[in-house]
A protein has these predicted regions:
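Pre-active-site segment of Zn-dependent metallo-hydrolases
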Residues: 54-70, 78, 84-129, 136-141, ...
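Divalent metal-coordination and catalytic microenvironments
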Residues: 85, 95, 128, 135, ...
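Catalytic core of the metallo-beta-lactamase
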Residues: 82, 86, 176-236, 255-259
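Cap/insert and terminal regions of metallo-dependent hydrolase folds
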Residues: 17-21, 25-27, 123, 147, ...
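Metallo-beta-lactamase
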Residues: 49-70, 150-212, 293-318
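Active-site metal-binding loops of divalent metal-dependent hydrolases
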Residues: 96-99, 129, 187-188, 218-220, ...
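Structural motif
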Residues: 90-92, 122-123, 180, 212-214, ...
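Zn-dependent metallo-beta-lactamase
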Residues: 1-93, 98-100, 289-292, 314
């Protein structure tokens, strides 16, 4: 049975503690200018409008969650960057989004299962404020007086949704909740949700639970910080983004599949699970291309057996 955290603290409290991440913030924010090879293309006519006429794929099916023993981790990919991570004690939900639209961007693949099929959620993590990671409509339905962790500056976007307490984390800071240790890590991205809120931070999460360690990267371009993350934590499972690398702005904000393999090697993790592809068309690359390129790169590096390409809604015990 999932544990239940104490509910004695006041609802909607935002706790903010500074870690040692100031230097990392200065070096990981993306620059506004496009990369040198960028060729301007029309995202509206090339991607957004054609996507409106693509039939939404994927099937909702009640998930068959297995019994989890001590020392095991069960991971279910919901779609995009959304994951359910389970131990024999705790259910953790990361970057949940069940919405059919990101404003004008159509969801092209359904979530692996309906939201009401979720088990009781003990803890929620949101990596940053972008609409494809922080979906207030979904979070409002998920919130049931449990804690949520977000980067510094993001708490005011979730504090009114029904969570018991909001933990705003700085880079390398850890919050302990029951059997969980949750740490925020740097990434190379940006955190603004609108035009005038670039103060919001962004990052990934390292989750230590049940004797295992999982790294959810959030959104990130490749950057040298992956090696430091691997030095600080012994990572078993790395959830790494592989899509939206042909960004319409030309900014280097997402890894391509080959860079994800490079990041995985520097993290020195045991298993690579790709994410952030196939759900929303956020870049110019074809929807089917990211996993194909990932597997080709993994074969070239002799690590194909370490890559686990998941199917939405199908739990996997590791």
């Amino acid at each position: 049975m999932p544990i239940r955290f104490s509910k004695k603290s006041h609802r909607n409290v935002v706790r903010q503690t500074s870690g040692d991440g100031a230097a990392a913030k200065r070096s990981t924010r993306v620059r506004l200018r496009p990369h040198a090879d960028w060729h301007k293309r029309n995202f509206l006519t090339s991607v957004l409008i054609p996507s409106l006429f693509i039939k939404r794929s994927g099937n909702h099916a009640p998930p068959q969650f297995p019994k989890i023993r001590e020392g095991e981790i069960c991971i279910t990919w919901i779609g995009h960057a959304s994951f359910l991570v389970q131990t024999h004690e705790v259910n953790i939900l990361i970057d949940p989004i069940w919405s059919k639209w990101l404003k004008v961007i159509k969801r092209l693949k359904r979530p692996g299962f309906e939201l009401h099929h979720l088990p009781a959620i003990d803890f929620v993590l949101v990596t940053h404020a972008h609409f494809d990671h922080l979906d207030r409509r979904t979070l409002r339905r998920v919130a049931a007086d449990q804690p949520i962790a977000v980067p510094i500056g993001v708490g005011n976007l979730v504090h009114d949704l029904g969570f018991h307490i909001v933990h705003e984390l700085d880079y390398w800071q850890t919050v302990e909740l029951g059997p969980l240790k949750i740490s925020l890590t740097p990434c190379h991205h940006w955190g603004a949700r609108f035009l005038a809120d670039s103060h919001r931070d962004f990052g990934g999460f390292v989750i230590a639970a049940n004797g295992r360690t999982i790294f959810h990267c959030g959104d990130s371009a490749y950057f040298p910080g992956f090696k430091e993350i691997g030095d600080r934590y012994k990572i078993d499972i790395a959830l790494l983004p592989i899509g939206a690398y042909e960004a319409p702005t030309g900014r280097e904000v997402h890894m391509n599949p080959e860079e994800a393999v490079k990041a995985f090697l520097e993290l020195r993790a045991e298993t690579l699970i790709p994410m952030h592809y196939g759900t929303f068309r956020l870049g110019f690359e074809p929807l089917h291309e990211p996993p194909q390129r990932l597997l080709a790169s993994a074969r070239a590096h002799g690590i194909e057996e370490k890559v686990l390409v998941m199917t939405e809604g199908k739990p996997v015990v590791l």
